[in-house]
Amino acid sequence: IYPVPDHSEMLFSIQSDPEETGTSVGIYFMTDPMPMNTLADYRRKLIMRFQDVMFQQRLVELTKKEDSPVLFARPIEGHFVRSKDVHYVGAWVKEDQVEQGLEAVLTEIARIEQHGFSEGELARAKYQGKRFGEWWDQGDKTWSDYYVGQCQSNFLRGDPILNHEIERKLYEELVSTITLGEVNDVLGDWF
């Protein structure tokens, strides 16, 4: 495992690609890897999933504002390398409004840090999570890359491989126990 050193200062890079047709900005927040071995670890994963769903909805609302410099934005939580986990926020911005687009995304992150999410946002995220049930019901139609990702995580990180029935049971057992306070507390782990 090659370690990625921690740092207190912001690191940045400006890149261009003549073949790229759009302009984007990306922000990476790195942490030490979080284990996935216990029920508590899986519960934390659900909390983070809800946080991502709510953050995604905030970013969608940002793109709908009149004259928004952001065309599309998305948060992604995952593994960067084996020695670091990452929370990534990517935004596709108007060509001539890169700084304004980055500022808009950072402003939304600051707003979330300061005020957190609301009960209504969490209720909507939990409702959307129930739609996973439709996906779990179609396990025989799941793309193989889902299983490849599970095998990779198991081999590289020791994460368990969960089948659809187990994952559905865990979700249904845990979803009602997750509180807004817990979701808002996890923000401090990322931002």
Residues covered by each model-derived region:
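Short, surface-exposed beta-strand/loop micro-motifs that present aromatic residues
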Residues: 9-17, 187
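Divalent metal-coordination and catalytic microenvironments
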Residues: 49, 105, 183
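Segments forming glycine/polar-rich beta-alpha architectures that bind adenosine-containing cofactors
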Residues: 178-182, 186-191
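Long, His/Glu/Asp-enriched segments that create or flank divalent metal/ion-associated functional microenvironments
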Residues: 44, 48-52
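Short, surface-exposed recognition loops and adjoining beta-strand edges that mediate ligand/DNA contacts
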Residues: 2-8
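M16 family metallopeptidases and their MPP-like homologs
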Residues: 16, 20-43, 59-175, 180
